[in-house]
A protein has these predicted regions:
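An N-terminally biased module of ancient metal coordination in phosphate/nucleic-acid-related enzymes
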Residues: 1-86, 94-98, 160, 167-171, ...
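Conserved residues at the C-terminal ends of beta-strands
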Residues: 38, 107, 154, 194, ...
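A structural motif
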Residues: 32, 37, 101, 147-148, ...
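Charged catalytic cores and adjacent phosphate/nucleic-acid-binding surfaces used
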Residues: 1-10, 20, 31, 112, ...
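Extended substrate/RNA-proximal surfaces in nucleic-acid metabolism proteins
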Residues: 49, 54-187
Length: 268
């Protein structure tokens, strides 16, 4: 099993109540060697109920303290998950350059100023229309924002569709997805394999293995592994499935990040 989880949330994220210490202790108990905290920093998130923002100076003080405290047991990296929207390029450029992050995930949590987590997004459209809109917005976002290392959970939108994965496949959206993958590869960006899809009952990881295979075929090499856990019990969720999936898709390595630089590790 891969021993590095590079997508993890704590109480610094508005959708988690777990103290960072609890995540570290569970990761050690599970035998992980490396973890990277990637709490949510979503500028201009729609609505006022859940502002996905945290004080970054406080975050770094806490994470550096934990890194020193547990340095003999686990390697703790300090990252962030930024929420991509096309008008936020300058804001994220300034933000990311202001702190010594090890790793930056760029994720699309908002499509056309709406959060697909809520059913209203799907009310006036079919799942296929909604998914295509999300992929097109993703392409717009990554063209507008340069300050991230990997694109998070590419087909995240499928978690919340009315029929979820019933009518979803890579081939149905291959034109849009291929443009996303080609752009990322051309600009030195990677993708992540996010196991939360299994947790949500989709039966596949994010992105779907068909997309992982296509990314590899197109020459993509940078691929991090993360469970997107918000609770200790979700750390390294279903990680025993990851190496076989990656091998089947043509990969020999996975990727970790340190000081914003990719480090390639052979699959176990």
């Amino acid at each position: 099993m891969i021993k590095a989880d590079f997508h993890m949330h704590t109480s610094f994220s508005s959708d988690s109540e777990t103290m960072p210490e609890k995540m570290v202790e569970e990761a050690i108990r599970m035998g992980l060697k490396t973890i990277c905290f990637t709490d949510h920093q979503d500028f201009d998130f729609p609505g006022e109920e859940t502002p996905f923002l945290f004080d970054t100076a406080t975050y770094f003080r806490k994470m550096k303290k934990l890194r020193e405290m547990y340095r003999d047991k686990i390697d703790i990296r300090i990252g962030v998950e930024i929420g991509l929207q096309p008008h936020l390029g300058n804001a994220y450029k300034e933000y990311v350059s202001s702190y010594p992050f090890d790793f930056v995930i760029g994720s699309v949590h908002v499509v056309n100023q709406m959060d697909p987590y809520y059913g209203e997004f799907f009310e006036d459209k079919t799942d296929s229309e909604a998914y295509r809109q999300a992929f097109l917005e993703t392409l717009t976002d990554i063209r507008a924002i340069k300050d991230f290392d990997v694109l998070g959970h590419i087909d995240y939108i499928v978690r919340y569709g009315k029929e979820k994965e019933k009518y979803y496949s890579y081939t149905k959206f291959s034109d849009e997805i291929d443009e996303i993958l080609k752009y990322l590869i051309a600009h030195g960006k990677g993708i992540e394999l996010n196991t939360a899809g299994f947790k949500y009952g989709l039966g596949f990881c994010h992105p779907h293995p068909e997309i992982l295979k296509r990314y590899c075929e197109l020459g993509g090499e940078i691929i991090t592994i993360g469970a997107d856990g918000h609770k200790p019990e979700h750390i390294a969720y279903d990680f025993e499935k990851v190496a076989p999936i990656l091998r089947e898709c043509g990969f020999k390595y996975y990727t970790e990040f340190k000081e914003r630089k990719p480090v390639f590790k052979q699959l176990p």
